């Protein structure tokens, strides 16, 4: 029996290693050599900022996508950091999709970056919910393969209260514990299982500032 249990433990460990991955996200322009360095370090996903919280396209986005493709990064996502004070959430999504129209086939996810209660959002849960719903509704028909939400238990409730309107979308959450696993995740606002975790932030690697991410 002990032998069987040991075999099961080893099999589970190998399975988890085989089907877990690490990636990076960047908020600045990244050249081809940078992505080649990340690929050599076994990072297989790049998440690139394409819309800034000031309410405009990040023009580093398309060159960074091109460089990630040339370097052979397997999975490329983009993220949109919305500008609440700018209004018109639908336009922010369509502006992003139009900017990326020639790259939509190359992208896996559009992530909506929802963070910063009291800093990037109003003091009204209802107004914030309406804005986020506008982002989600527009994103569903904008041509992206998948749409997800970047947020955390320390951020989302402070923006929308107990609202669970994002629960049907994959969640990418942040907890800088340095652990490449989901053992720390606690369900909140309807989310019961994470898609991806940002486990380390503000790291300098390959000469660039990055955050590190884990997914299975």
Swiss-Prot record:
SUPFAM superfamilies linked to this entry:
(Trans)glycosidases (SSF51445)
Sugar-bearing residue positions: 31
A GO cellular component term found in this entry reads:
extracellular region
Cite the Ch-type lysozyme domain residue spans from the record.
Answer: 21-216
A single Gene Ontology biological process assigned to it is: peptidoglycan catabolic process
Name of the protein this chain belongs to = Probable GH family 25 lysozyme 5
Enzyme Commission number(s): 3.2.1.17
Give the molecular function GO annotations. lysozyme activity
Keyword Signal in annotation: yes
List of catalytic residues: 25, 113, 115
Q: Tell where it localizes.
A: Secreted
Q: Pfam families, per this entry? A: Glyco_hydro_25
Q: Which domain of life is it from?
A: Eukaryota
Catalyzed chemical reaction(s) = Hydrolysis of (1->4)-beta-linkages between N-acetylmuramic acid and N-acetyl-D-glucosamine residues in a peptidoglycan and between N-acetyl-D-glucosamine residues in chitodextrins
- Give the similarity note: Belongs to the glycosyl hydrolase 25 family.
Question: Which N-terminal stretch is annotated as signal sequence?
Answer: 1-20
Q: What class of enzyme is it?
A: hydrolase
């Amino acid at each position: 029996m002990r032998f069987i249990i040991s075999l099961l433990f080893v099999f589970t460990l190998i399975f988890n290693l085989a089907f877990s991955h690490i990636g990076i996200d960047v908020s600045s322009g990244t050249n081809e050599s940078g992505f080649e360095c990340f690929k050599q370090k076994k990072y297989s996903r790049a998440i690139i900022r394409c819309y800034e919280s000031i309410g405009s396209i990040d023009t580093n986005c398309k060159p960074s996508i091109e460089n990630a493709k040339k370097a052979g990064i397997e999975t490329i996502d983009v993220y949109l950091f919305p500008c609440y004070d700018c209004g018109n959430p639908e336009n922010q999504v369509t502006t992003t999709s139009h900017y990326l129209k020639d790259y939509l086939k190359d992208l896996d996810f559009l992530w909506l970056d929802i963070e910063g209660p009291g800093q990037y959002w109003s003091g009204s849960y209802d107004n914030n919910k309406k804005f986020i719903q506008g982002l989600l509704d527009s994103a569903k028909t904008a041509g992206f393969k998948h749409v997800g939400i970047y947020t955390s238990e320390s951020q989302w409730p402070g923006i929308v209260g107990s609202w669970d309107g994002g629960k049907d979308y994959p969640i990418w959450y942040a907890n800088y514990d340095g652990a490449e696993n989901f053992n720390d995740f606690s369900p909140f606002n309807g989310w019961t299982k994470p898609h991806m975790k940002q486990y380390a932030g503000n790291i300098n690697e390959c000469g660039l500032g990055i955050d590190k991410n884990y997914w299975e």
